[in-house]
């Protein structure tokens, strides 16, 4: 395949890059991440009891929340991204789940209303989490760290400022301590992510626009050509993911 054919394929991926909820199935067999050293879902299930009232902040399309199989009458969720708000309104509300549009900075829920608040890769505000939790309530979060995908971003887009420069476990833990929480568990890791074709990386970069600012095939052509060379030399395009886990108790 010559380079012009590659470019046409990359532009095709660019055109179709969209997402419902948080569904990466389009590139499922075209990239791979190392497994995290913890199981976020299992950690939640270890704490969860049917009588608990739970809230999922930044629920995406609600897919993960529904996988917990928690009683719907004790389940609440919130989301700010308009396409996902529409999706959740269609899927969660008819089930009896208390879904409300809103951001993690100011959850639209009453004081001391929840036994457990969960948040995977979403926004949060430690004092607000404290406000909506019952005494003894738990906050469990898995977060994307400040250094996530930085090698890939620099490969395609050059030097850019990280979008969330304070996203480190140490900084986040201190914010929760300052808000009055006790830290029960705190873990952080840096793991490998690999892409097996450049088109998959194009789709990925278009989806995660906040990490890859102003990315397009045309504006980042030199970076994409370098990515293609790296792929041909190494069999993959490699970067790092940055994640951390925090469990805090009110």
Language-model regions: role of each:
Residues 1-25, 34:
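N-terminal, positively charged/glycine-rich alpha-helical extensions of SAM-dependent methyltransferases
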Residues 19, 24, 31-53, 63-67:
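Conserved alpha-helix/loop element of class I SAM-dependent methyltransferases that forms part
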Residues 53-107:
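Class I SAM-dependent methyltransferase SAM/SAH-binding core
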Residues 105-116:
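A short acidic, Gly/Pro-enriched loop at the edge of an enzyme's catalytic core
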Residues 124-140:
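A short glycine-rich, Lys/Arg-flanked "PGG" loop and its adjoining helix->strand segment in the class I
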Residues 145-163:
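Short, glycine-/aromatic-enriched active-site segment of Class I SAM-dependent methyltransferases
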Residues 157-171, 212-214:
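Acceptor-substrate binding/catalytic loop of class I
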Residues 182-250:
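Conserved Class I S-adenosyl-L-methionine
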């Amino acid at each position: 395949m010559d380079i012009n054919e590659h470019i046409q394929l990359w532009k095709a991926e660019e055109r179709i890059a969209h997402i419902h909820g948080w569904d990466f199935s389009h590139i499922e067999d075209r990239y791979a991440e190392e497994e995290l050293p913890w199981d976020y879902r299992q950690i939640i299930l270890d704490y969860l009891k049917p009588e608990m009232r739970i809230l999922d902040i930044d629920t995406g399309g609600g897919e993960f929340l529904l996988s917990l199989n928690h009683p719907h009458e004790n389940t609440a969720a919130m989301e700010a991204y308009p396409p996902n708000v529409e999706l959740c309104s269609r899927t969660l509300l008819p089930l009896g789940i208390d879904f409300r549009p809103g951001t993690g900075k100011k959850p639209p829920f009453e004081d001391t209303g929840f036994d457990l608040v969960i948040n995977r890769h979403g926004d949060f505000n430690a004092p607000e989490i404290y406000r909506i939790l019952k005494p003894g309530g738990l906050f469990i979060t898995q977060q994307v760290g400040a250094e996530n995908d930085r090698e890939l971003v620099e490969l395609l887009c050059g030097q850019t400022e990280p979008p969330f420069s304070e996203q480190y476990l140490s900084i986040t833990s201190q914010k929760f301590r300052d808000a009055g929480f006790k830290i029960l568990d705190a873990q952080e890791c840096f793991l490998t992510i690999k892409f097996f074709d450049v088109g998959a990386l194009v789709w990925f970069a278009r989806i995660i626009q906040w990490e890859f600012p102003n990315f397009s095939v045309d504006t980042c052509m030199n970076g994409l050509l370098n990515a293609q060379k790296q792929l041909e030399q190494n069999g993959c395009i490699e970067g790092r993911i940055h994640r951390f886990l925090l469990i805090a108790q009110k």
